[in-house]
Amino acid sequence: MREKNSSRLGLAAAVVGVLGGLLVWPAVGSAQLTPPPQIGPVAPVLGATTVLAGTGTLAAGTSDALQASGVTAGIPSLLTGEVLHAVAIGYPDQIDSEASLAALALNVAGTSIGADFVMSRATAVVGSAVGTSNIDGLSINGVPILVTGDANQTIGIPGGSVVLNEQQSLPDGTLVVNALHAIVSGVADVAVASATAGFSGGSAKAVQASY
C-alpha cells in the first residue's frame, strides 16, 4: 500500500513517529540543495521489473515525505517477504531514505537466499551523501554468511553474485544503497532494501526485481 501526503511538517513528524526512532538524522545546514539537470533513465536489462513497497521519487529540495508498506508481499517463484517498509523524507537541503523487510526468502536460478531482517539507509545533506545497511540472519543455500558491514561485500553464486551493503554513486553524486543485491546474468537482478538520496531525489524500495 502506498500513501502520499503533501503536508510538510505534520507528515514528517508522523513518519518519524512510525519509525520509532530508527532514523537519526544528521544536523541540517543552511545551504540549499539545488538539483542539476536530471540524468536519463536506465533501461532494464531483463524483461519485467517489479517493485514491492516503493515510495516513488521525492524531488530534491522538497519538504515532504513519501512512504509505502506491506504486511506480506512476494513475486511468484522468486521472492517472499514480510513487514515491508519504505520511506523518503525531504527538506530544503536534506533527503533521508530508508527501506527494510523481514523474513526474506529469495530463490535465484536455484540459489536460495534467506535473511531474518534486511535494511538500508541513505542520507544526503547539501550534496554530501552517506549510507549504511543492516542484514541479520543471512544464509545462502542454508549456509550462514558472515556480514562484515563493509561496502560492496561480494559473494559468488552459480552464474552471478550477491553484493551486501552495495553502495553506488551516480554521476551527480546521488547515493544508492542496496542492502542486498543478487544478480544472475540473464536470469534475474534483485535489489532488496534499496535507499536513494541526493541531487536526483530521494526514494526507497523494499524490493526491486528484474527477471
Whereabouts are the PLM-identified features?
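Sec-dependent, cleavable N-terminal signal peptides
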Residues: 1-31
